Every structure is written in structure tokens, then in C-alpha cells.
């Protein structure tokens, strides 16, 4: 065998393996490199012996086996057959200069006109370029120069790089002596005269219509992919096979009968002017509307129930009917047809099936099956031997027929149905229960009723089981009274009752027009439900905007969200201002904010006080709003705010103001000593008090982080809390206290008894502490008294803020400046503070503040003997907590 590592019997360079064979020690001779490998069948000299060329296993260059072995692609020179050309350094430098000048490099070999956009591409090409050796393959010459190329792509690159500004010369048409194969579509701008027939092997795309003046004979079937308009009738001599449905837009006259072997779908109504003879059964899957009376010459067997929406006039007299027991498979009509019946069908069947006028009805107002007229949906067996009866005559054999059809002789049934009868479930009897109005007073039951209605509509083709049908057969024979049957009262034509009755006849149930959810199977049951439903709808309707809701919870939420300031008529009539406040408080708790009810005002408030303040001013002109006024004592001008008044006094009247009247409140301070904002405006007192409280909270949070609580003593010592006294609690009637305690037990809260005070507390002790400082009552409220000066305040925050601003140096005391030895101060200073003073006055955290010796002596606190009697015990009592609010006072 030939060595797989050699080509054409030659040893490849770099291979040292010997080929397999019978003689494993065979030697091989390396041949010189030849440009042309040995041809197939040529003898090869190997090892001094002439070996015939092996055609099947000799890898000829160009064959697939040779390509796989060498790993080279077609069209490239083989590395084994060609030595790579060396490139001198000077030539490389020339290429670099040329590339810098023109951005491309041209092959320097004569006869080669290729250009490359990179030096690496030219280097690879130059090592393998054969120059003019391939001149016989240069079939694409350049029309502007002497260059020639082997492919059209190379010619296009050359033209774009060198002759871009010169237009292409027009090609001259030459005579075609041989057939030309056209592989791509050719655009033809002028008509081409064809003298001989042209054979077309492939389909030719025609974009414009071609006028044909002579008939064209077609030897093969021509597939038509697009619709071709036909203006003249095309005579068809042979049958044409139609594989796809052909839409017919115009009427086509048919002179001969057309045999239809397959079903033809009819999507539009087809007018039939002549009678069509039907020899086979036609299955009708959809209901066919019949607008004209159809004459039926033969009886039509109906296997399924037929819904009849209008009364059918019967021209012939029907013989007396018999009682028929309906099995489950036969009773496919709606349930109302099998169990209930209206008055209209009972009246229609009076002359055919005589029934007594007075019969007992079920509890829910439904008519029993004995009063039911036989519907045309069932095929009843009739006695053919009985003669026809006139409408006015009473059938003589009616009683005997009814007696014969009693429960003693039931009709024959299918034994297979009787075998499986016990497996069927008996449907529950309709009780006619109405939804209750108690509880949440909502329509929550309507959801279940709606689900039941959906299930009933899907199962309304199923009737009651055979047990129900057996129960509804009268146990005793019916006796027909001799009196004429009482005429049935029909509702007025076109009235709602007639529509409901018609709906019961057609669908087996009628929908309540009030709620459009609940359905009833009898007119009496529907009326009974409508009475309750109307009350339910009225109770669940918003009294302000008349919107309807399904539950009481939804109505309450809507009222709170949209009409929070508008109480309902019932609530407005029952309660007064207190009830209205409670209602608004509940709305605020549930909704989070209160909206202004005025039209065009979208203000919302998160507090009851802000809402009531806005209500007193919303929609009123400024003159009607009773705002406070601050008159100037110098010029008489009035201002709406104290800040505006103070600014006017400081800017216009620099002289000191006259003495203030004696009746001025003691808590009012000098306007010149108030704090200002960085912009120069007077800072509001409420804002200053709020900042003070925030500082206290921050100090507490800072002290809570330390492992030892001593830092809090350094920040705010206990002596600072004893520089003012709280007012004493008022003496109250024990009976009044007991009444308040009972009110807290019942309601959970108690209101302030003073007029125009809206304070509310959850404990009697909190209310008592509030009454000590409430200024809206008839009694004189107690004051918070500063122990460092004779000023009094109505709130604890006011006296704290006063001490912070006026007596700031008294908040921090050091051993360098011990407090005066006063009996009141000795009793007020705790033991802990005394130990600190004796220890040498070392304090952690803050540098002691030195007091000037010029401090006035008037800053000393007054003697305990000068305090009011009610404040002695208060001042002597030390406060250990951070802050004791008014609601935390102990109850006496």
C-alpha cells in the first residue's frame, strides 16, 4: 500500500514513518521536489524497483482525498510544490513608503496588477506570486489601462482605486451565435422581436401584463398563483379540477344539476325560490330561522326538545292526552319546563288536558306539575282511535283517560335506565329563600347566587331525576268539577310581567331587573325577591351622591372617603356637635386625613383642629373671618399678627413704648427681647417651644447611649427642674369623679367639661391635671410659676422656655460658684448634687462656666415663706423623672 504520509508515492518532508506492508523493512528514496506530481498510472521508482502507479490510492492534487491529506483549500498553491520567495529589506522599505503615500501597495512583479490595502497581504502574495506565468487566465482587462485580472472582483477593486472619476464605457451589442445561459433576471427596456420560438426551461417572472394577440397553445398545465381577472367567458370543454375553494362573488346561472359529493359550507343565507327535494336526512347543527310558515305534509319525529317562543296555532283538534313519565334522557328541556309552568301554557292546554281550577300550590308560590300544560317540546303519545273534539265540547273520555293514566300504570321504561337510576343524584328542591337584610346588610349572598345562576345556565338542559318525576304524579285520580274552568288572568300585553313570564317560558328563569344578578323560576318568586331587593338597594345607596354599593362596608368606606364632612340624615338628626366631633375623629382615624367638603377646595388635614379651623374660614371673605387684631399704641394701626405689630413698633417707633396696662397677661414678654430668625423676622413662640422640646429629646437620646447615666446630669441637672412650680389640682366633687370614672369604663375616654374645649383623656387623672391649667372654664386656672422671677405661665412648656431664655445661667451650676445657702435651695438640691460640690467641682464633658461678680442679687430665688400656700409642697417635692406632663399627675 501507499504510505499515507506521502503524495503520489513521494515522502513528505518531516515524516519518518514507513508505510505498512508485507515487508516492514522496506526502504524508501526521497525524490526531489517536482512541480508536477506523477500522473495516474505512471510507474514510480521506489527502492531501485519500478512500482506501477496506484491509481485508486494515489492522491492526485485536486481530489478530495488530496485536500483532506494536505489540509489545503482548492485554488491555492501547495507549500510542498513551491518555494517561498525571500523579500529584501529595501523592497520592504519601498512598500512602506508607498503605503504611507497611497494607503495601498502594488505587487512589483511584472504582469501582476494586484493591489493590497496592507503590507501583510502583499507580503503573503509576493512570496507566492507567479507574475506573467498566469497571463492566459487574465480574462478581465481594464478599459482604461493595460492592467488585466483573473476575476471581476479584482477588476472592480482596481477601477475603484485608480479610475473612480472615469465613467464606464457603454457596452456594444454584438451578434450572439451561441445560446446564452441567463442565470439572473435581465431588465429589458425595449421590446425584443423574437422570430423563432424560444424554449423557456424555468419560469419567467412577468411584472407587467403581456398583450397576446394570438392564441397560445399550452402543452403543460400552468400553475396560477395570483388571481387573473377574466373579462370574457372562457369555454371549458373538459372538467376542471378545483383543489381550493373558489370564492363566488356574483350569481352564476346553473342550467344543469350539479352533483355535490362533499359538504359545502354556507356562510351567508342562500335565498331559495323553488322547493328543494330532499331525499336524504339533513343534519342541522345551528338553528334555522323560519320567517314564513312551512307546510309540513308528514309528521316530523322530534328526538330533542324544541324551544317554542311564540304560541303555535293548532288547526286540528288534538285527542285527549295521556300522562307521560319522562325519564332523564327524555327530559332535556330547561328545568322550568319540567317542574314549573306559567299561567299561559296552562290556559293553552285547557281544552286538551282538562284540569281542576283549584289546586294546592307549593310553599314558594310555584305551580305544581299537575297544573302544567303539556309543552310542544315533548312528543306525547295520543290515542288515534278517539275522534276529533270541538273546542267548546268537554271530552267525555277525559276522566277515564286520566284515571287510566294514574300511578298504578306507569309507562314502560328502558330497562337500562332503570338499572342505573340509583346512581343519579336528585337535584335539590328550590325553596325560594331570599337574601337576609340582617348582619352586614350587604349583597354578599349575591355572589353565590350569581355563581349558582352560571351553573344553572350550563346545566339547564338537564331536568329533574326520575324520582322527582315519579313524585309529581298525582297520587289520587283527579276529579273534574262540572263548573267551567275559571279564566286565567293574563297580564297586560307588553308589560313587564308578560316579559318576565315569556323569559320564564323561553329560558326557564327570569332575572331580577333591580340587581340583574338573582334569577327566579316563577313569577311569584321573582316578585317576592324584588320586594326585598328594592329595600336592599335603597339601604346600600349613598345618600349624598346616590351611588349604589354591594355591601355596607363599601358604603361606609365611600362615605368616609368622599363625604367625611357630610353626615347622613339619620346621623345629623340624632346627634349634635359632640357626635359630629366623634364621627370626624373616627373618619380621621380610619382615613388618615380629613378633606374639605367645599367645592373647588381640595384641602386635606391630618388633625381635627386644623380641619375645624379651616372649616370656619373656608369660603368666607376676609372681612367675615374673626381674626385677632393687634393695635399699635403709638399710631393706632392694627395688625393681624403679633409679629407684624412688633416689627412695626421696632421700625417706626424707636422710642420706648408707653407702660403696658395692668390687665395685660403676665406671660406676655417684651417684644424687643424676642428671638429672631437669620432673615430678621421674629421667631414664633410655638416654634421656639418646639425647638426646646426637641433639644430635650436629643439630650435624652444622647444620655441613653452612654453606659453610665451621669452624662445626663452634666447636660441637664436636676436643679433645673425645680426652678418652677406646678399649679395645684382643683378640688372636685366626689360624685363628679365617680361619673367620670364610669364614663371612662363605658366609652374608654372622657371629655373636658368646659365649653369650647375639645380635650379628651383616657383617664380621670389626666383630666384632673388638664383642668388645673384649662383656661376655658369658669374657674381661675392655676399657673406655672417661675421661682427665679415673679412671672407666671399657663403651660409647663412656657415656663421651661422662659427659664431657658432668661435664666440660662441657672441651668448649669459648678463648685466654683456654689448656690446660695438658702433653706429652700438646701431642701431642693438633692444629695447627689451636694456630693459633687464637695468633691472639688470636677465635671466631665463640659468646661465650667464662670459667672461674673457683677451678677445682680435680684436673681436669687424668693424665700419659701413668700411662696403661695398651694405651691410650698410642690416646690419641696423633687422630681426624679425627665419630664412629668400634665396627664401624668397622680390622682387624689
Curated annotation (Swiss-Prot):
A zinc finger (C2H2-type) spans 105-129, 140-163, 540-563, 594-618, 630-653, 750-774, 784-807. PROSITE patterns: ZINC_FINGER_C2H2_1, ZINC_FINGER_C2H2_2. It is found in: Nucleus. Its main location: nucleus. GO terms for molecular function: DNA-binding transcription repressor activity, RNA polymerase II-specific; RNA polymerase II transcription regulatory region sequence-specific DNA binding; zinc ion binding. Residues 8-19, 385-398 have a biased composition (Low complexity). Belongs to the krueppel C2H2-type zinc-finger protein family. Interacts (via its NuRD interaction motif) with RBBP4 of the nucleosome remodeling and deacetylase (NuRD) complex; the interaction is direct and may play a role in repressing gene expression. This is Zinc finger protein 512B. It comes from Homo sapiens (Human).
